[in-house]
Amino acid sequence: MITVRTIPELRAAIAAHPGAGRPGKRPAFVPTMGNLHDGHIALVRQARPLGDVLVASIFVNRLQFLPHEDFDSYPRTWEADCAKLEAAGCDIVFAPRESDLYPEPQTFKLQPDPQLADILEGHFRPGFFTGVCTVVMKLFSAVFFASGGGTAVFGKKDYQQLMVIRRMVQQFALPVEVVAGETARADDGLALSSRNGYLSTAERVQAVQLSAALRALAQAAQAPGAPPLAALEQQALQTLAQQGWAPDYLTVRQRHDLQPPAAGAAAGTLVALGAARLGSTRLIDNLEF
């Protein structure tokens, strides 16, 4: 496994790799912000057979953090991350410095569809998906430029992000196949997240309540004669608040566009999504049903 810092170095490393540079040979790519856990590594292992050279990026993207969020304190665990990536079969780690990826102010930014990107996470974190789309487009350009395309793996844990990236790829006719990876969970059901490390011991025990709330909401929505979704969502919010959380949203949406479902929406087409703060830690999760 090799590590590169700049876009020219990355493109040269991909071209020089034995699995690339031949007709029909394409990269597989997993973008990360580092501080890797088993969920990230599952995505890397999933990507391994999907390309001829496997690239993972480590970059904490300032553009997707609000001023009051944890950009400066976000854990940087470089040596441990590289060891995990190498063990998972990664060929190239692209770890640009901010000056490498943004050598000048990024005045051109992608503005995603507000119907998809200004709801849910985008409502509570304004500008988040502009930052995500801008950096992902730049990473796609860096990784897939020479090959003319390839495969990128994104986790369902960040469900709305996955939908936004898929829409971006479709809208710009990018030669990238976006593959979804299932959410990795701890034994008690908590979705693995880099921010779980912010939880105290007591909060970590309590944190499973978010996934339990989503499961209960999904079950209630499918019950015969269920009340209107708005009433079920309000009840779920109240229950989580009574348990000591500060919830942003708990809601049921259509999977394909994250809009409220039509009456009688078929099972297998919906997703329950939630975001809530426990102490100082904001967690998100989702459950397809």
Curated annotation (Swiss-Prot):
The keyword Glycosyltransferase does not apply. It holds the Pfam family Pantoate_ligase. Beta-alanine binds at residue 64. (R)-pantoate binds at residues 64, 161. It catalyses: (R)-pantoate + beta-alanine + ATP = (R)-pantothenate + AMP + diphosphate + H(+). Its EC number is 6.3.2.1. Keywords: ATP-binding, Cytoplasm, Ligase, Nucleotide-binding, Pantothenate biosynthesis. SUPFAM superfamilies: Nucleotidylyl transferase (SSF52374). GO terms for cellular component: cytosol. GO terms for molecular function: ATP binding; pantoate-beta-alanine ligase activity. ATP binds at residues 33-40, 155-158, 184, 192-195. The active site is at 40 (proton donor). Catalyzes the condensation of pantoate with beta-alanine in an ATP-dependent reaction via a pantoyl-adenylate intermediate. HAMAP family: PanC. The reaction proceeds by a bi uni uni bi ping pong mechanism. Homodimer. Belongs to the pantothenate synthetase family. This is Pantothenate synthetase. The gene is panC.
